[in-house]
């Protein structure tokens, strides 16, 4: 509703379905000007990227935002230029197997927080895990509200800039 308040001529397609390889056929990519990937599964992300590339539809993909605390660490880059992000590393390897070498992504240069066996939150370093965060008996949430939302805003900005050719 909000999009139509801003632009009554906008076409908004809402799908109440997860995009997975087995549901991909329910989406007609010829209707899209741009694809925004915020899928949490690698198989879904790979299928979406492969299909968008095959249909020559521009796509931007969000890499890992879970277990991050710094919303200012996001960057926009080609997947081939990413570092630090474990999801980007997996995506880069799997995309290469599919003959895809370029994908516009939003990724974080922050190392993800990990849990030690004691339940301590720490950061992975070359030497191992450091205890620089806090102690908790509860598992760390997968993400903080303020981190993935920033990735979404960055992706939205990139889509607008690409579609309007604003640079």
Locations of regions flagged by a protein language model:
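Adenine nucleotide-associated cytosolic modules
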Residues: 1-167
